[in-house]
Amino acid sequence: MLGTLRNLYLNSFLYDKKISKPFISSLKYKSSTYLLSSLVKIQTKKINIDEFVFDAVWTNGNLSNKQFKKLNNFFWIFSLDLKSSSSSVQKIIENWIEINSKYTSKSWEFDTTSKRIISWLTNTKLTYDNSSEEYKNNFNFIIQKQTLHLLNQINNLKKY
């Protein structure tokens, strides 16, 4: 019963409004892959993103749960060649934001969301740099929103 009520709340307009409050106006983040080497397994074989088609990837209902998590946590960005088109990566993120800007239990699952934030912020050369102001605003907003969601989840764990 409590889980059902919590799930209703997490999918509500009130919860979306709660985690949609921006707390910083812009993102200034430059990362080093060395800092996260203990968390992330970086592949030596690099992939060029321009060799793939990602038009309907976020709406593909044929993915297994494992494939869905791998796709949505964005850790595959660590396998990309830095010579890949940043505009292609940014378009993929932009599409993800359009479809997943509101909480859903599957794409906003705690582990998946935390990995997605790590991936996006660690790979700013592809995910953020050389993008439009509109994209940066949307990116900053969704990073903050996901962070607030994670903080909310952590705070709720402490209560139980």
Predicted regions and their residues:
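Extreme N-terminal leader/anchor segments
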Residues: 1-54
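Generic preference for well-ordered secondary structure
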Residues: 23-26, 42, 60-64, 100, ...
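Aromatic-lined, polymer-binding surfaces characteristic
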Residues: 64-160
